[in-house]
Design a protein with these regions (language model features):
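Membrane-proximal periplasmic segments of bacterial cell-envelope enzymes
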Residues: 1-164, 171-172, 197-201, 207-208, ...
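Solvent-exposed, polar/charged alpha-helical surfaces in well-ordered, non-transmembrane soluble domains
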Residues: 18, 31-35, 39, 69, ...
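Second-shell loop/turn segments in exported
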Residues: 18-26, 34-38, 61-69, 94, ...
């Protein structure tokens, strides 16, 4: 079956290629024939060994086996001219999977690859008798059964040499189902271009459906290289690259959420009555201490000379200025049990994705988890760290984007999915749906939305009062965006020392986060952006988010459709 994006653009096609095949029963001397083919098309030892493995897995006599995939016109000509001397050797036309967008869609789509020895042990030999390929990753893997189709057959009468004398019965093959995904190729391109050459990821969802509009992980790779088998050197370069292009950061990367967690902690405080919109702390000079404990938990603007802090801070200012001290204090008052219970409502610590088999669950720590994994009790300092999304908590970018979509929906949960139409969603999709986050007064949602809006739009209010992202993305914006920046620590900074990005090796710098949804009044898109080792989330990740939202809300087919309506 074929795969299309939400606008009908073909993103997984089947392309005709020519393969060199061999039927063992028609070959007098296999090694001599392979030697002759080596002269004509050049067969490596690896290719010959792979062919012999495929030959050993044949299901029936007179079944042709590919020797070489994707013949060039020159190779076809050389074999054709010498065909008289190569009984049992044929050039066969086959359809093979082709990804027209190459590396752009690799991590969103997954890929098909050649069936290997391990695969063959578990596959239905009849169902796969017409193909050498199998969905191995992502959507291609999850919907393999629906995309595969069914093989046809002919019942024939042959002579002693295997030549067909009469066709007794035949059933034509049936193609697999075509799928349409939620993903938008234009938005995918915009997200990829916004990230540029940096390592990172973007996940964007439609809050109304949970449909994944874009899923980018960079660097990427060309999935076409794997369809008919990648050579060892090319694979080794991808496998051993320090930038790990084969790693799907959007689904498998697990990172501290940093300050992107603060709106969820704030809502937990409001839901449980632990804080109020009016409650105010005085943050000066920018650190927090637990009772009977000398350790300083510092705000992000703390300085060694004693400067720092945010002055008087209520919940709204705590979000738009990203005040750590407010959330240290709130987390301790909440306690880990209530934090764990309420964050789980948004899907943290859970894998709720339907059709992305590589997605991971992140980690939402608890007392029980720490006791079971480390044999240690939960300490108050652990709770302090969770208050600003650090410590043991881990999220995947998909998971964080999904939580932001639930926030944008005022508590209506969604299940992230790639499939838009074409086949029925599996039964397990129903089990993935979380209960809605209910019994939250509208004024609490309004307060969180307004506070996240001020992260982006509050500017020109005097020193120290601008939203953390305003200077980077808040000017000349044509819609209302709710956002929150965050940084995830990669290495710890000793007590009493300032974080100096210039002094750190690039791979030790913080990861930059930005989450957002827009328009605030009627959210159409929610997203999470991560730039690995990028530094500050507002400075580095928020411009990426702005470019993506500008494209989707102001330039894309979505915008055209809105105007038509």
């Amino acid at each position: 079956g074929l795969i299309y994006d939400r606008n009908g653009e073909l993103i997984a096609d089947n392309m005709p290629t020519f393969q060199l095949t061999l039927t063992k029963e028609r070959v007098e001397n296999l090694d001599a024939t392979l030697a002759k083919l080596d002269e004509l098309v050049g067969l490596s030892d690896e290719e010959i060994a792979s062919f012999k493995k495929r030959m050993s897995r044949r299901q029936r006599p007179f079944e042709s086996v590919p020797v070489l995939y994707r013949l060039t016109p020159e190779e076809i000509a050389r074999v054709s001219v010498n065909n008289y001397a190569l009984p049992g050797v044929e050039i066969e036309a086959r359809l093979v999977r082709h990804y027209p967008n190459g590396e752009l869609m690799a991590h969103a789509l997954g890929s098909v690859r050649r069936i290997n020895e391990e695969d063959a042990k578990t596959l239905d030999s009849v169902a796969y008798s017409g193909t050498d390929h199998l969905g191995k990753l992502g959507v291609e893997k999850f919907y393999e059964k629906q995309l595969l189709g069914t093989v046809g057959y002919q019942q024939v009468e042959t002579d002693a040499r295997g030549r067909v004398m009469k066709v007794l019965d035949s059933v034509p093959p049936r193609p697999g189902e075509d799928l349409t995904l939620h993903v938008d190729v234009g938005l995918q391109k915009a997200a990829s271009e916004a990230l540029g050459d940096r390592r990172g990821t973007v996940v964007a969802l439609d809050p109304a459906t949970g449909g994944i509009l874009a899923l980018v992980s960079k660097p990427s790779y060309d999935p076409n290289l794997f369809v008919t088998g990648i050579d060892y050197q090319s694979y080794a370069e991808l496998r051993d690259s320090g930038d790990v292009p084969l790693f799907n950061r959007a689904l498998q990367g697990q990172y501290e959420p940093g300050s992107t967690l603060k709106p969820f902690i704030a809502l937990t405080g409001l839901m449980t009555g632990t804080t109020t919109p009016e409650f105010t702390i005085h943050d000066d000079p920018g650190w927090f201490k637990l009772p009977n404990n000398s350790r300083l938990y510092r705000d992000w603007n703390w300085k060694k000379d004693g400067r720092g802090g945010h002055g008087d801070v209520n919940l709204q200012k705590a979000i738009y200025r990203s005040c750590n001290v407010y959330f240290f204090d709130l987390a301790v008052k909440l306690g880990i049990d209530r934090i764990h219970e309420n964050l789980a409502l948004f899907g943290f610590g859970l894998n709720t994705a339907i059709d992305l088999p590589e997605a991971r669950s992140g980690l939402l720590p608890s007392r029980d988890w720490k006791r079971a994994t480390r044999g240690l009790p939960w300490y108050p300092g652990d709770t302090v760290n969770i208050g600003i999304g650090q410590g043991d908590m881990l999220v995947t970018p998909l998971q964080l984007a999904t939580a932001v979509a639930t926030l944008a929906n005022r508590g209506k949960t969604v299940v992230p999915r790639m499939l838009k139409s074409g086949v029925e969603l599996p039964e397990q999709a129903k089990a993935k749906q979380l209960d809605d986050v209910e019994q939250v007064p509208e004024q609490f949602w309004d307060l969180i939305f307004e506070s996240m809006g001020m992260v982006v739009h509050r500017g020109n209010m005097g020193f120290g009062e601008n939203g953390t992202a305003w200077a980077y993305i808040g000017r000349n914006i044509a819609y209302q965006m709710a956002g929150k920046s965050g940084t995830a620590q990669v290495v710890g900074i000793p007590q009493g020392e300032e974080y100096d990005e210039e002094e750190l090796a690039e791979r030790h710098r913080k990861h930059a986060w930005f989450v957002a949804f827009a328009p605030i009044e009627d959210p159409k898109i929610a997203l999470a952006v991560l730039v690995e080792n990028g530094g500050g989330g507002s400075a580095v990740a928020s411009p990426v988010a702005r470019k993506i939202l500008d494209y989707y809300l102001l330039e894309s087919r979505y915008k055209v459709a809105q105007l038509d309506d």
